[in-house]
Amino acid sequence: MKNYSSLIIGGKKFSSRLMVGTGKYKSSQDMVESLSNSETEIITVAVRRIKNEQSGENLLEKINWEKYWMLPNTAGCVNSDEAVRIAILGRELAKLSGQEENNFVKLEVIPDKKYLLPDPIETLKAAEILIKKGFAVLPYINADPILAKRLEEIGCATVMPLGSPIGSGQGLLNLSNIRIIIENAKVPVIIDAGIGVPSEASQAMEIGADGVLINSAIAQAANPPLMAQAINYSVKAGRQAFLAGRIKKQDFAVASSPEKNISI
């Protein structure tokens, strides 16, 4: 049974339901301000891109790791063997940052360079190996209810179906499948990829997602810190709306004023 009062992943409790990525920012200052404005507690770090090749900056030195929980990801991996190797490196990075107990990994296995769609077979294979190695696995997948359930059954800490392709800003294109995943899951469902604006983040939360992970929508906005703040508000509003319960849709109008006992 899901816990609706707080977000619990791998036995760790979080108050924020917004996860934020650290890539694509125009400057490290934009990134730091955006992270602060988002009020996130979990930030993703691409292990293979920890050092900015253009500026030479190291993410580990720019972020206060006492404030944020590191979620190393295996971006750039094209098969399960690569993903396992990078995940192990990511766990060591977390330890170097002072998070000795951090065994989280965002599992990405993406051989498709054009559409950046995850490989379901290699993802499942890597997840099985990593779980045996003691990782809390957060797998990035297509909106496939059967795969999501299988990953849950083998012990993944969450499932992370995409809303639409990475960085596309197309929003939630497969709502029916995402709804099925949410309905059937006993682990947190985090919508990852494709969200472009706050209203889409709110929509994900309104249908019952446990959280969202957002990078491009913030990092590539004209004003990233302001967008981070807007998305933070939208995630909170969407969650409250889900808990409050929306009205039933009708095929006809329903008067809001009483039709009986009218005094005038």
Swiss-Prot record:
The keyword Transferase applies. The active site is at residue 106. One of its GO terms (molecular function) is thiazole synthase activity. 1-deoxy-D-xylulose 5-phosphate binds at residues 167, 193-194, 215-216. Gene3D superfamilies: Aldolase class I. It is an enzyme of class 2 (transferase). CDD domains: ThiG. It catalyses: [ThiS sulfur-carrier protein]-C-terminal-Gly-aminoethanethioate + 2-iminoacetate + 1-deoxy-D-xylulose 5-phosphate = [ThiS sulfur-carrier protein]-C-terminal Gly-Gly + 2-[(2R,5Z)-2-carboxy-4-methylthiazol-5(2H)-ylidene]ethyl phosphate + 2 H2O + H(+). This is Thiazole synthase.
